Structure formats: structure tokens, C-alpha cells
A protein has these predicted regions:
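Intrinsic disorder/low-complexity segments enriched in polar/charged and small flexible residues
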Residues: 4, 18-21, 77, 88, ...
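Extracellular/periplasmic head regions of type IV pilus-like filament subunits
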Residues: 52-120
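N-terminal single-pass transmembrane signal-anchor helix
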Residues: 1-23
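Short, surface-exposed interaction loops/tails
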Residues: 100-165
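N-terminal alpha-helical signal peptides/signal-anchor transmembrane segments
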Residues: 33-58
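Amphipathic alpha-helical segments typified by the pilin-like N-terminal helix
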Residues: 19-37
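Short, functional N-terminal and low-complexity linear motifs
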Residues: 7-15, 30-35, 76-79
Length: 165
């Protein structure tokens, strides 16, 4: 009987002490997702500024190209990073696509929607039907073939248009 009581108390204490650690882990994951979304927003703004100054289509711009053009803010992690988690493509119609450079990116669509104020230009790419699924209202935007750029299935995508002068 005493063994059962001691075991119950030990399990309860283990759960009690483990609960804050799980909350801290979840807070760290949320913060990392917020950071990734913020970095993607800065990257998107830099790409838009680059294509405003360089009116080229059916291409993408590298991180080195963005740095060389001086469109990355000096305070941004992107300005000092040798690599970036994001890439881009501008199609012939001038539409800009911002998406992860590789598969396996963290799920950050909720954070992107918060940053974009629930814009329909933010969504999840569905490779099966080549659409951008918007979780805001369930719409699907058909995406064209992006030259040699490949958007990973299930990746967050943020559309943009280079501003006109």
C-alpha cells in the first residue's frame, strides 16, 4: 500500500515539474516561428524594393544580389547572414513569390497571416493542384510554373507585387 502511495506522489511530482518545461518549449517554438515570419517579411520587402529598382521578370534575385543592391536593412539578420531560408521568383506578369528555399520549413502561416493582417496573398502551396491555399477563407489561387524555381509542397508562400514609381 505504501509503495502505491509513494509511486502516485512521485508521478504527480514528475508531472508537476515537467509541465513548466513543456510550456517553455512551446514558447520557444512560438518565438522561433515569429522570428522566421519576421525575417520572411523583411526579405519580402527587400525583394520588392529590388524589383522596383530593377524591372526584370522571369527571374529571381539572390541574397548576394539583395545585399549588393543595398535593399536589406543593416539591422536585419539577413544583412549579415551568408545564407537565407527564403527564396523568390518574379514571373512574367510581375507577380513576386516568396517561399522557403528548401523543404521542411517551420509552419509559420499563422504568424504570416498576423503580419499581413489576414491577407489572401499568404497561404500554403499545394503541389498536387499547383495552388496557393488561403486558410483565411479557403480559396485556392492557381499558380503558374515558376521557371526553374520549385516551391516545396506544403510550404508557406507570400505573394507580392513590386510597387510602381
Amino acid at each position: 500500500m505504501w509503495a502505491v502511495l509513494i509511486m502516485v506522489v512521485m508521478v504527480a511530482l514528475g508531472g508537476w515539474y515537467g509541465w513548466p518545461a513543456e510550456q517553455r518549449r512551446e514558447a520557444v517554438v512560438r518565438q522561433q516561428a515569429d522570428d522566421d515570419a519576421g525575417t520572411m517579411a523583411v526579405y519580402r520587402e527587400a525583394v520588392m524594393a529590388y524589383f522596383k529598382a530593377n524591372n526584370v521578370t522571369d527571374t529571381s534575385v539572390s541574397l548576394a544580389g539583395l545585399k549588393g543592391a543595398g535593399v536589406l536593412p543593416a539591422w536585419s539578420k539577413l544583412a549579415t547572414s551568408p545564407t537565407v531560408a527564403w527564396t523568390n521568383y518574379r514571373d512574367g506578369a510581375g507577380q513576386i513569390y516568396i517561399f522557403p528555399a528548401a523543404a521542411g520549413a517551420r509552419p509559420i502561416v499563422a504568424e504570416l497571416l498576423a503580419l499581413s493582417r489576414n491577407s489572401l496573398n499568404v497561404g500554403v502551396y499545394r503541389a498536387a493542384d499547383h495552388t496557393l491555399f488561403s486558410p483565411v477563407d479557403g480559396t485556392r489561387i492557381a499558380l503558374p510554373t515558376l521557371g526553374d524555381a520549385v516551391i516545396p509542397d506544403g510550404a508557406p508562400v507570400w505573394l507580392a507585387q513590386a510597387p510602381c514609381d
